[in-house]
């Protein structure tokens, strides 16, 4: 499905049921929302996508030149895959409920927000925010879940909470003015925060990194350079 809707506030809702999608497993759903030259206060998109069942695949691209677009994605089942790309000023809520679900998120430019929830085992989330003023927050409940966050440019914030065993959380932030927090409750968890800083520039604020761990056999690494 694709389309241009100049002058309209779009609110599509998409639901994927496992059996019907599994019958065309080789096909990847591509859903794109594009915007014409409508007034700025009307260029707002709201989309809700649900994957239910097993082995579903989703590719979603949301592009807008104005802030305020919102997307909600829910993966409920086993071995679902979602690939999501957003422009600037977007908000995304992601829920992974089940096992072996996989989500790749790319948010560009400025002031993007992501809130995520992982519930189950062996789920994977990869986030790439390429801009400034981005905010990422969320939690994982279960075992062997992984969250990998990469924030570039400046003044981004990320907060991850994991409850369970053998989980992995990684936050990498480039440039200056970042904040990163990882909280892990359980055993054999691994946390890593890496923050960069512009060389020969004393006018920029350095990053702030915090790791909290409770349990046994955990590993924590903070690199600021």
Spans of model-derived segments:
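Long, low-complexity, polar and repeat-rich extracellular regions
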Residues: 1-225
């Amino acid at each position: 499905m694709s389309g241009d809707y100049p002058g309209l506030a779009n609110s599509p809702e998409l639901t994927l049921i496992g059996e019907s999608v599994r019958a065309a497993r080789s096909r990847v759903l591509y859903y794109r929302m594009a915007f014409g030259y409508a007034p700025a206060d009307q260029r707002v998109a709201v989309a809700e996508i649900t994957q239910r069942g097993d082995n579903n695949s989703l590719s979603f691209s949301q592009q807008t030149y104005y802030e305020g677009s919102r997307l909600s994605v829910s993966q409920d089942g086993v071995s679902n895959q979602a690939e999501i790309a957003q422009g600037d000023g977007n908000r995304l809520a992601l829920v992974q409920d089940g096992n072996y679900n996989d989500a790749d998120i790319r948010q560009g430019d400025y002031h993007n927000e992501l809130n995520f929830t992982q519930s189950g085992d062996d789920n994977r989330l990869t986030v790439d925010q390429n801009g400034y003023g981005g905010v990422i927050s969320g939690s994982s409940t279960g075992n062997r879940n992984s969250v990998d966050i990469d924030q570039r440019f400046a003044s981004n914030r990320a907060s991850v909470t994991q409850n369970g065993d053998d989980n992995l959380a990684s936050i990498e932030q480039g440039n200056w003015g970042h904040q990163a927090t990882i909280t892990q409750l359980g055993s054999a968890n691994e946390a890593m925060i890496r923050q960069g800083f512009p060389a020969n520039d004393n006018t920029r604020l350095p990053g702030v990194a915090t790791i909290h761990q409770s349990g046994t056999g955990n590993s924590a690494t903070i690199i600021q350079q």
